[in-house]
């Protein structure tokens, strides 16, 4: 599979339907909808836009605690980023999904992942005046994402 045609949504869908990666019924259902929507032309998939977001996160976003390594997205994260930034409304060309509700199990890096998506939207996505919200059951939890976002790109001088 060449790099241009690589689609993480399809790859993740194949992995969860084959049983190679375990996923719940709702995850399987949403990826089935995404794959069918892309295949039947309900939406346009722009691989270049999806890859741009993934590359930004992996090349400019650093861990905000502990080590200072760049983030390395897992397949499920690449599939989510691809869905957010690569699936477009066929009539308008705008992102199909403008609001995203992520439910991720404990200790899977959801705060850092959300902060990386926020950084891409703030610095690169090109939407003037974009509003980014962090919601959580407690203010302290939402503040973690805000603090992570603030520290995420600090080691990257090329953004300054």
Predicted segments with their positions:
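Phosphate/NTP-binding elements of NTP-utilizing enzymes
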Residues: 1-152
